[in-house]
């Protein structure tokens, strides 16, 4: 459809070409060509690292150094301060974790809730999840649809089963899945006593949120924990009425999320308004949807023209 739109808009044939093939197959051809000039990749962190290694192994073959841009995985967070409003925190979780079944790299998948808010937040998110309608996307009243494939279904289900069988975790809502009539997974919220629990660290890429309840007086310690828990740094959000606490979080988490949200869910960046991307294991942070990304693909050329060329090599300070 995209190529049809380009053609209908008048783009000449050959300016853009679409080749549908596996990344492994095409990389074995493209990465060995001396004219290879750049890669813009969106996908998993491990695949991106493999592609980068492949480019590096062929670096002597290329006419120039290839540009490499990647937007990869995320383990995106929500952190609530003790001053936050419980209903706002619950809504950020419900929307941030479960829109599109959590199948986007910016979806929230771990949350840190203070002890003083936990009772109210827990009650609201359970109420929210139980109210979700699940079914076909053709019915726009359905908040939850099927996940994209059987492979994704099986992977997500394995994380849910891991939590069910762990002494360090409790599923407070959801936890069921069924692929008899489509790859449907019930939105699931896990509460863990271990901030390094598997589903707090690894990217699940599905409708699974894991929550760690922290001592309400340990704000800065919790922010440090958030920063060090995951290899990713794509998106994150903090919710706080206390402005000083929000500014503290903004500073302490400056390397934890390329897209950082205050009093909102950590997803839903608007193209051309909120440049998107993160660093660490989440990619090269070249900000898709902005001029910053476009500049990665140009090759600047500097030209100097002298209108009065010198006729003597001697500079004035050299004397006669």
Residues of each region from the PLM?
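ALDH superfamily catalytic-core signature
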Residues: 8-10, 15, 32-34, 38, ...
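Conserved residues at the C-terminal ends of beta-strands
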Residues: 22, 42, 211, 239-240, ...
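Beta-loop-alpha module in the N-terminal Rossmann-like domain of NAD(P)-dependent dehydrogenases
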Residues: 23-29, 43-48
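A structural signal for short, well-ordered beta-strand elements
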Residues: 82, 212-216, 239
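Glycine-rich nucleotide-phosphate-binding loops and adjacent flexible coil segments
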Residues: 207
């Amino acid at each position: 459809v995209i190529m049809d739109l380009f053609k209908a808009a008048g783009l000449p044939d050959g300016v853009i070409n679409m080749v549908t093939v596996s990344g492994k197959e095409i990389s074995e051809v493209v990465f060995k060509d001396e004219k290879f000039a750049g890669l813009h990749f969106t996908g998993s962190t491990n695949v991106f690292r493999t592609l980068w290694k492949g480019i590096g192994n062929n670096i002597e073959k290329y006419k120039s150094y290839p540009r490499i841009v990647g937007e990869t995985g995320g383990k995106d967070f929500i952190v609530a301060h003790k001053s936050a409003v419980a209903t706002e925190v619950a809504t950020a979780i419900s929307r941030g974790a479960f829109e599109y079944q959590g199948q986007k790299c910016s979806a929230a998948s771990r949350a840190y809730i203070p002890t003083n808010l936990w009772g109210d937040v827990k009650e609201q998110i359970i109420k929210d999840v139980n109210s979700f309608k699940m079914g076909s996307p053709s019915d726009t009243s359905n908040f939850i649809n099927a996940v994209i494939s059987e492979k994704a279904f099986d992977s997500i289900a394995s994380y849910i089963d891991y939590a069910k069988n762990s002494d360090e975790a409790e599923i407070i809502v959801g936890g069921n899945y069924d692929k008899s009539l489509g790859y449907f997974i019930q939105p699931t919220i896990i509460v863990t006593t271990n901030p390094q629990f598997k589903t707090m660290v690894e990217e699940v890429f599905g409708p699974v949120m894991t929550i760690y309840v922290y001592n309400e007086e340990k704000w800065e310690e919790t922010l440090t924990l958030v920063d060090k828990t995951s290899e990713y740094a794509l998106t994150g959000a903090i919710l706080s009425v206390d402005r000083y606490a929000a500014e503290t979080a903004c500073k302490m988490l400056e390397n934890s999320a390329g897209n950082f949200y205050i009093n909102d869910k950590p997803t839903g960046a608007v193209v051309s308004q909120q440049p998107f991307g993160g660093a660490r294991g989440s990619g090269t942070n070249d900000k898709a949807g902005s001029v910053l990304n476009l500049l990665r693909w140009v090759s600047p050329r500097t030209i100097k023209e002298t209108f009065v060329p010198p006729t003597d090599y001697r500079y004035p300070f050299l004397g006669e």
